[in-house]
């Protein structure tokens, strides 16, 4: 989904490539050499990190299921309503949480700048949680973010990506991916049709 969103927002893609060039260099070889000698440079890719966080906000991973333990009341109250939670499993809807306008202004917009340090409107603690929190926290979160940063670095410096769905393909709402609307029942968001793309080598 990151490639799709960046294709739809070329101004953000330009800013991202500028950051890559300033931090690690303008070609694959310079990037590899820079990361081998100074892997901490990945920490300087603030916009890259923000792009990944915003992508995961809009297209989050599957929820963590939590089985409710037996409690004395076995009932909870939420927004004036009472729920019986005996022997139930509770799941957090990340899609709903991540698109709340009180937590993320203009929630349907792809705006990675909201995640940059010093953003005008700070994001409340625990509002962004595609890797979940507490006992359900994903221990591989940091590794996953590092891998995705390196992937964007090495691909965007050399290639352009353009979605290429057939005209007869079913289309969903643009805010949920358009032709690449989320489908399937796996742990992560699966684009409809596999998100076919045309990949072009960038001119030097």
From Swiss-Prot:
One of its GO terms (molecular function) is monooxygenase activity. One of its GO terms (biological process) is mycotoxin biosynthetic process. Heme binds at residue 138. Signal peptide: none annotated. Pfam families: p450 (PF00067). Gene3D superfamilies: Cytochrome P450. Pathway: Secondary metabolite biosynthesis. It comes from the Eukaryota. Its cofactor is heme. Keywords: Heme, Iron, Metal-binding, Monooxygenase, Oxidoreductase. Its EC number is 1.-.-.-. PANTHER family: CYTOCHROME P450, P450, PUTATIVE (EUROFUNG)-RELATED. Belongs to the cytochrome P450 family. Cytochrome P450 monooxygenase; part of the gene cluster that mediates the biosynthesis of the indole diterpenes penitrems. The geranylgeranyl diphosphate (GGPP) synthase penG catalyzes the first step in penitrem biosynthesis via conversion of farnesyl pyrophosphate and isopentyl pyrophosphate into geranylgeranyl pyrophosphate (GGPP). Condensation of indole-3-glycerol phosphate with GGPP by the prenyl transferase penC then forms 3-geranylgeranylindole (3-GGI). This is Cytochrome P450 monooxygenase PC-23.
């Amino acid at each position: 989904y990151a490639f799709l969103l960046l294709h739809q927002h070329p101004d953000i893609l330009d800013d991202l490539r500028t950051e890559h060039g300033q931090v690690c260099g303008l070609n694959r070889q310079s990037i590899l050499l820079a990361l081998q000698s100074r892997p901490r440079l990945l920490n300087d890719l603030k916009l890259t990190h923000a792009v990944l966080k915003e992508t995961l906000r809009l297209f989050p991973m599957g929820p963590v299921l939590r089985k409710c333990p037996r409690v004395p009341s076995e009932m909870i109250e939420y927004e004036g309503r009472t729920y019986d939670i005996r022997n139930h499993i509770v799941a957090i809807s990340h899609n709903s949480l991540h698109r709340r306008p009180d937590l993320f202004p203009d929630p349907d917009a792809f705006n990675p700048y909201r995640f940059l340090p010093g953003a005008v409107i700070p994001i409340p603690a625990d509002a962004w949680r595609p890797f979940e929190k507490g006992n359900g926290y994903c221990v591989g979160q940091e590794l996953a973010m590092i891998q995705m940063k390196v992937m964007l670095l090495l691909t965007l410096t050399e290639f352009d990506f353009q979605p290429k769905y057939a005209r007869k393909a079913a289309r969903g709402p643009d805010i949920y991916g358009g032709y690449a609307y989320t489908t399937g029942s796996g742990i992560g968001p699966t684009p409809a049709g596999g998100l076919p793309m045309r990949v072009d080598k960038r001119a030097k």
